[in-house]
């Protein structure tokens, strides 16, 4: 965008975008998730960042059972929901690890895995969570991803395959939008780095292809002569007639 003249639409848009990129209490990821829980949203780019928040196993009330099968269904379902609320969208591998740690078990055999799959399916059928492949989350968590720093997780959990596409897409959009214009590999590398991943390997590049293509399809970023720039929808904000939130996107 060319230099804006005071009083022009460009100047207003730049002010609007600056305010969004420097979020107040109503522009945080948590605030937008609460909004979209009530109103429904397709996508909201959030601009605050946070450390990866891990579930406290002591909060899940699962210990004291000799076998995983002895855990009451209601207690297991409640534990899954608490983990999802804290870490969602969460990969099945991490979800399983959290449940095992809370219940005092070291590994998940076929029977334990089956119970966890059944719990996910049951909660999904009830509409309490959304299932996307091996990921579980509240519906608004997929529409409003939070940008998290994964660097404090152990190596076994800190894997790109454990990060949902929506969070990877958010990191790409944020990286491009906050920088201006970036070559694809640079955007991918910087997007990974801000999430706590060290470098862009061939596998990482492959992993980021689908989120990047989706961001391009949604006009969150655009391709300019082979480089990436912020798209017209990067700053879009949903609104309802009764809500003061407006959009210039």
Task: Place the predicted regions along the sequence by residue.
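N-terminal compositionally biased, intrinsically disordered segments and leader/signal-like regions
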Residues: 9, 27-29, 247
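A detector of low-complexity, intrinsically disordered, Ser/Thr/Gly/Pro/Ala-rich segments
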Residues: 6, 24, 243-244
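Charged, low-complexity interaction regions
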Residues: 20-28
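Short amphipathic alpha-helical heptad-repeat segments
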Residues: 5-12
